[in-house]
């Protein structure tokens, strides 16, 4: 489903990703965790070329792109197709403020997949029901809570029928009482067998849904394993240090 080989990302002299190798299978739920500045979000953004990698190979489904390749029409087309297969949900909701919830979701199927307004509306209605917002179809973002806006953002990404969903700390901008409603939607996607890659600090959620946990630090994958292995019996000292700090913060 996803294969990353030798992925390097530099911002000037700063090497943020230092040769990442990662394979994610179809229907697998992978949680990426680590301290701030470890390269988690950059890795996620490289997976669908929101960030152009410096070196390495990225494959999503049948679409394979080498980093640093010649920017020609064929490469642009492959990247465009790869992006269609990867839904991306950001920390901030990035909804169009002048469009209603249903209009936000309709935008992608019409603009990218060439659907008719009627077809796009049917897709949007189904997805709003899926995320528990059927009664908010005609509300504008300003009329929705943060949790509701993020659920619309998830529905908008699902409207493009992606192979994989990428979540970049989807609850970090939410008030604590709104976090669970978003996590429940993500959990339902996992239960349906969708391939998910999630950057999150929600450790209990990771324990609950992750097939595999990847711990990153300083641009490297330090350790990976099942959620049980990582949370109950981490092998690397750096992983143990990180988890103990997170647990201390949660306890307080």
Model-derived segments and their meaning:
Residues 65-87, 117, 233-234:
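ABC ATPase NBD coupling module
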Residues 140-144, 148:
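Conserved ABC ATPase signature
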Residues 159-163:
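A short, proline-enriched helix->beta-strand linker immediately N-terminal to the Walker B motif
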Residues 99-107:
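Short coil-to-helix segment of the ABC ATPase nucleotide-binding domain corresponding to the Q-loop/switch region
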Residues 165-168:
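Catalytic Walker B motif of ABC-type/P-loop ATPase nucleotide-binding domains
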Residues 224-225:
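ABC ATPase "signature
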């Amino acid at each position: 489903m996803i294969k990353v080989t030798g992925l390097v990302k530099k911002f000037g002299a700063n090497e943020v990703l230092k040769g990442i190798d990662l394979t994610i299978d179809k229907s697998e739920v992978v949680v990426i965790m680590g301290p701030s500045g470890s390269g988690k979000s950059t890795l996620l953004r490289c997976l669908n070329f929101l960030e152009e990698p410096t070196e390495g190979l990225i494959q999503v489904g049948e679409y394979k792109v080498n980093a640093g390749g010649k920017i020609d029409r064929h490469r642009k087309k492959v990247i465009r197709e790869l992006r269609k297969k990867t839904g991306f949900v950001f920390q901030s909701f990035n909804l169009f403020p002048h469009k209603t919830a249903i209009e936000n979701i309709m935008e992608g199927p019409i603009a990218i997949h060439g659907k008719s307004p009627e077809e796009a509306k049917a897709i949007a209605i189904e997805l709003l029901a899926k995320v528990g917002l059927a009664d908010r179809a005609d509300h504008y973002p300003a009329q929705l809570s943060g949790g509701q806006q993020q659920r619309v953002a998830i529905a908008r990404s699902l409207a493009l029928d992606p192979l994989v969903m990428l979540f970049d700390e989807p609850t970090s901008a939410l008030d604590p009482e709104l976090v669970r409603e978003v996590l429940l939607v993500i959990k339902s996607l996992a239960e349906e067998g969708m391939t998910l890659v999630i950057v999150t600090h929600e450790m209990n959620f990771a324990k609950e849904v992750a097939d595999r946990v990847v711990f990153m630090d300083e641009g490297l994958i330090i350790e990976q394993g099942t959620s049980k292995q990582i949370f109950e019996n981490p092998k690397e000292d750096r992983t143990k240090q990180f988890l103990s700090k997170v647990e201390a913060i949660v306890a307080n």
